[in-house]
From Swiss-Prot:
GO cellular component: cytoplasm
Top-tier EC class: ligase
Protein name per the record: Isoleucine--tRNA ligase
Family matches, as CDD domains: Anticodon_Ia_Ile_BEm, IleRS_core
Cofactor(s) this protein cannot do without: Zn(2+)
Family statement: Belongs to the class-I aminoacyl-tRNA synthetase family. IleS type 1 subfamily.
Gene that specifies this protein: ileS
Positions annotated to bind ATP: K626
Pfam families: Anticodon_1, tRNA-synt_1, zf-FPG_IleRS
Domain notes: IleRS has two distinct active sites: one for aminoacylation and one for editing. The misactivated valine is translocated from the active site to the editing site, which sterically excludes the correctly activated isoleucine. The single editing site contains two valyl binding pockets, one specific for each substrate (Val-AMP or Val-tRNA(Ile)).
Record's keyword annotation contains Protein biosynthesis: yes
Binding site for L-isoleucyl-5'-AMP: E582
Lineage of the species this protein comes from: Bacteria, Bacillati, Cyanobacteriota, Cyanophyceae, Synechococcales
Catalytic activity: tRNA(Ile) + L-isoleucine + ATP = L-isoleucyl-tRNA(Ile) + AMP + diphosphate
Keywords, sorted A to Z: Aminoacyl-tRNA synthetase, ATP-binding, Cytoplasm, Ligase, Metal-binding, Nucleotide-binding, Protein biosynthesis, Zinc
Amino acid sequence: MKSKHNKEKKSGFSYKETLNLLKTDFSMRANSVIREPEIHEFWSRNKIDLELGSTNSGKNFTLHDGPPYANGSLHMGHALNKVLKDIINKYKTLQGFKVHFIPGWDCHGLPIELKVLQSLKSNERRNLDSLGLRKKATDYAKIQINNQLEGFKRWGIWGDWDNPYLTLKKNYESAQIGVFGKMFLNGYIYRGLKPVHWSPSSRTALAEAELEYPEEHFSKSIYVSLNITKLSDAVLLKLEEKDLRNKLLSSLNKLFIAIWTTTPWTIPGNEAVAINPRINYVFASDQNGNIYLFARDLISEICEKLDREFNVLLDVKGSLLEGLEYKHPTKNKFCNIVIGGDYITTESGTGIVHTAPGHGMDDFNVGQKYQLPITCIVDEKGNLNKHAEKFCGLNVLKDANDLIIEDLEKNNLLLLKENYKHRYPYDWRTKKPTIFRATEQWFASVEGFRSSALKAIEDVEWMPKTGKKRIYSMVVGRGDWCISRQRSWGVPIPVFYEKEGKGVLINTETINHIKSLFEEYGADVWWEWDEKKLLPEKYRNESDRWEKGLDTMDVWFDSGSSWAAVCEQREELQYPADLYLEGSDQHRGWFQSSLLTSVAVNNKPPYKTVLTHGFALDENGRKMSKSLGNVVDPNIIINGGPNQKIQPAYGADVLRLWVSSVDYSVDVPIGSNILKQLSDVYRKVRNTARYLLGNIHDYDPALEEIDIDQLPLLDQWMLNRLVEVSDEVTIAYENYEFSKFFQILQSFCVVDLSNFYLDIAKDRLYVSAKTQFRRRSCQFVMSRIVENLAVIISPVLCHMAEDIWQNIPYSTIEKSVFERRWPKFPESWLNPELNEHISNLRTLRVEINKAIEGCRTQQMIGAALETEVNYLPENEFFKNSLSWLDKFGNKEVDLYRDWLIVSDFNIVNNLSKDCLSIDNNELGKIQILKAKGLKCDRCWHYQNITVKGIENTKLCERCANIINL
């Protein structure tokens, strides 16, 4: 390059004007902050988004949107999720499917309620009634939805943004009442007293999906001794040895049951202790003469914990201990040992479980079996109530544990206290611990339709397949679903309670009436109207007898009803949906709640396929958090940060490219270094497209038809490779393996095009006469590449694809890339027989280029055209491929010297003595020599110059003919 410019300077004349140089308005820089919104405007103006998919003539494809929560700014999790969905929808649109994507939002629940309350002054909060709160919550949610909606649109996401589904809309709330009603009438919903996860900080019951388990939770665990007052009859029969029998009976004041618990505050609620009938237990005495009952397998651990030696007196099966009596540790009452289940193990503790039926599900089940009192000793705020007797008023998450432990210690019942690290449920919204608390709640009886749900899971395709095992095990093991919440911001449970008595009014008439009211007026009428207006006409005369319930439904019941409120209701969608796509945490959330409601109502799953993705982490694999300062903001990725040198504006397409680049089935990293790498890939693809566009500026395929058989071998291979790449990309999209698309795209643009085909094409494009076949044939191929490249990248790089399409220099039938259908090629383009020879020739080209580069590094030459190459083959495959090229190749294009971009190439039997370098490898001997002749000042090839150019420049015969000299 330098030598050419120097030569032209010396002569004072340049042939630049005679070359066919690149010409296009498609800029090297994306300028995405300005250009991408312009493209959105073009789509909107020409109805190239949602309406395009809706008017297709193919089959319906429904990707049902799992509703994000209408609170807070968009984050990388939103980006990963929504871009994945959009890639699929755009691909299906190009395939001709009817695609109508309805975005949705989850609008009810505590986080919005708390945001509203936090925005008010204390006196405003005190004066705010439920209806006022709902009005403010509605306004808040709509503002959040609008902010998120604009963000999604900026990412290039297509959807029915004018008609999204919102769980606060009247038609949605009405449909949800319909789902609840059908489940109730099918016998799957009931009201009962049961321990539920209770959040004292939120003052409401929580579902399993509303819990999180921080890694660093420590509980105050205690070992407690309970004084045995009476041995069971079975144990007495076991005591054949008279001395031992007498010893135990005479030592009842020193005979204890050893229990272990991590919730000391539940001790006042103790109604029994439970054992596993299959575990062996021992009565063992310590050095002080005290005798303790605990599991045999835990002797060593208990000795170490309590720092005591124990002597085993009696070994008994757990089943023999039933009925043994002990004195309650804090109350003046006596309780018994009962038979528990497999939840009692010897992994930790003593193998004997303190049982408070009002504060644990296993405890509750045992209590039901033995008809024990189901006593709740805690109020909704987490304070111990009158049933805790002397501890009444203490808070279970504050002072109750310490004072109860102190009382046990004072009464010589405390054996040990220590901190214990374990998984403990927290309220996912307030980030504070929860408790188990027995209250009257509404439940969905999963047991009633569990087998149907498990069968439905089998009928669904789960991607990845591990998702099936995950949700299957969850449904197998899950208890009844607590669906009632003690909050105002939600859809009310449509039930009326008898004021005087325990009657409950809910039936077909009341459900249908409430459903129709909500359809017309919305759920606010439940708080606005009195019972007389809410009840069906049949019951209005007795409205004084009833009062409406104030519980609302679990938000997972809200979103879990979306199949009924959206997919069943909208004609353009279908139920079951083709695809649900969300994060892997939704196996216990939306996937499961949707499955349970759909199966309970219609005995079928709401989806045909479920696809899951992982979470977005920082570059070091850590969870993003403000405290760590590692949060990556998608808005900053697109528009840049305050310091654009540190946080440049990459645009939405780089964000979308990131989504396509990762294995989203697992957690995925994102950060500044990754973004730089992605930006480089984006730039390479863009520059490849620019080169293609810039070299077809004077070409129109409609005016010049070229027969495939006329094309040079290189061009035939390139079209074959285009077909192969398109097929590979299609398979990647079909299988939702977008990272394969990313890899294929990189390889195609860099390896196949930039480093090979387009590198070789420079001489054809720049130097040839404008209409010369060697140039036109290349332009034909490039036009096919650029059009189809735009289409196959458009699901991911939608803005770049449209930008490419708008800069195609000739007329196209389609005004947008998205009006073009997915590529279909003439059969004649696919010619895999070319691959073996071309592959060999490319391999040889790489080795020769290495040798030339070695000479350049040692400053023996400047450009490759300053060399010629001698090749002595020692590999028949490569020799045959060169012969094939020589025999069948086009003499103006398929000369191997042109593929190498050297001035001459020779296959020799003997090497020259005078050379720059010799490389010897398994392909043969490669010799690099200085090119003979003089350099043509137009094409830079070294040849025997016979023509004197303008102002004493030198021209080869080819160039002289082209410019008519």
